[in-house]
Regions:
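Helix-helix packing/entry segments at the starts of transmembrane helices
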Residues: 52-54, 92, 96, 108-117, ...
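Transmembrane alpha-helical segments that form core, pore/gating elements
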Residues: 37-40, 49, 60-63, 122-124, ...
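Juxtamembrane helix-entry segments on the extracytoplasmic side of multipass membrane proteins
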Residues: 17-22, 45-53, 76-82, 154-176, ...
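Hydrophobic transmembrane alpha-helices of multi-pass small-molecule transport proteins
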Residues: 57, 63, 117, 125, ...
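Hydrophobic residues within membrane-embedded alpha-helical segments of Major Facilitator Superfamily
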Residues: 24-27, 31, 38, 58, ...
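C-terminal-most transmembrane helix of multi-pass membrane proteins
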Residues: 2-14, 55-57, 65, 154-155, ...
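Membrane-helix interface residues
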Residues: 46, 106, 132-134, 189, ...
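Specific transmembrane alpha-helical segments of multi-pass solute transporters/efflux pumps
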Residues: 31, 35-36, 64-115, 151, ...
Length: 319
């Protein structure tokens, strides 16, 4: 009786942990998705590099306080400078910089869909860099993703010349971030320390470039702009990182990656509601193709990792 009750209690705790994990993922996806129209509105008052860099540095300060409160060390190990610089360039400077720049030329919904093709680019880049050939399922996913991009811009017919810099910026963000997932090994730092240091190293040059090239007017920020700035600092780069790490403690990484496919969906819908951006048959078809394609890509990757783990386990047992 005791064994049954203890097993039931463990199952109950497992279900509860998974429920909390999925709730954390929904908060993460919603926070990141809503940030797309928020950034688009903020760019009417502050230029992209300066705005995103300032928000990143403010978020780094908040995360540093969180790390201190939970007892995480912020000390950098010796010899980590080069790895940290490369990681910060790909994961923060290129990702946040090009993402925000893209919104100067394309809509928030278009930017969200283009940027979140990064798993597809990671799959393509892993082939020449590590010799990992895509599985057939993943190839189907790649075709669907690129079909979705073409659909989004009407097969290229609806792509205006003035949108091209935005499309290239969004794709640069996706490709460089994907490159970072392949060539940059995890930093030997605690989670919040790793994010904080990357934000600092990546956002300082962003602010410097913004001051030198964009000449921002600090007093141009309205009350609404300040509220959006606070949201961009606290929610996507603060709360969402907290909920993301909380979800990873309760759910497998593959599951977490799949659920975050909600982010571009939420971004497109939020942009349609808040900014009146188009949300018709073409946008819906592009969403289905891109998100469906990414689901194929991620499932193919998780299956390959699972088979690799099983093979290593069999080898271990045979030794």
């Amino acid at each position: 009786m005791t064994d049954r009750s203890s097993q039931g209690g463990e199952r109950g705790r497992g279900v509860s942990a998974r429920a909390v994990g999925f709730l954390c993922l929904f908060v993460t996806s919603a926070g990141w998705g809503i940030n797309w129209p928020a950034m688009k509105v903020l760019l009417r008052e502050w230029p992209p590099l300066f705005a995103r860099g300032v928000a990143g540095l403010a978020a780094a300060a908040i995360l540093a306080v969180v790390a201190w409160r939970i007892g995480e060390s912020m000390r950098l190990p010796a010899g980590i400078g080069r790895r940290l610089t490369v990681a910060a360039f790909l994961n923060v400077f290129a990702w946040m910089g090009f993402t925000t720049l893209s919104l100067t030329w394309v809509s928030a919904g278009q930017g969200a869909l283009l940027v979140y093709t990064m798993p597809a680019w990671a799959l393509l880049l892993a082939w020449p860099i590590h010799g990992r050939r895509p599985e057939p399922r993943a190839v189907v996913g790649l075709v669907l993703c690129f079909a979705g991009i073409l659909t989004l811009f009407g097969g290229g017919i609806a792509l205006r010349v003035d949108q091209l810099p935005g499309v290239l910026s969004a794709l640069a963000a996706a490709i460089l971030f994907a490159l970072g997932t392949i060539v940059v090994a995890p930093l030997p730092l605690a989670p919040f320390a790793a994010v904080t240091w990357q934000l600092v190293v990546g956002c300082v040059p962003m602010v410097a470039l913004g001051l030198a090239l964009e000449h921002p007017r600090i007093d141009a920020l309205s009350t609404r702009g300040a509220a959006l700035m606070a949201y961009m600092t606290i929610v996507p780069m603060g709360v969402c990182y907290l909920t993301w790490f909380a979800a990873l403690r309760r759910l497998p990484g593959e599951v977490a990656s799949m659920v975050t496919l909600l982010t571009p969906l939420i971004g497109v819908i939020a942009a349609a509601i808040a900014l009146g951006e188009p949300l018709g048959a073409r946008q819906a078809a592009a969403l289905v193709l891109v998100i469906g394609g990414l689901a194929f890509v991620l499932r193919g990757q998780s299956k390959k990792r699972r088979l690799g783990s099983e093979e290593r386990a069999r080898r271990g047992r045979s030794v």
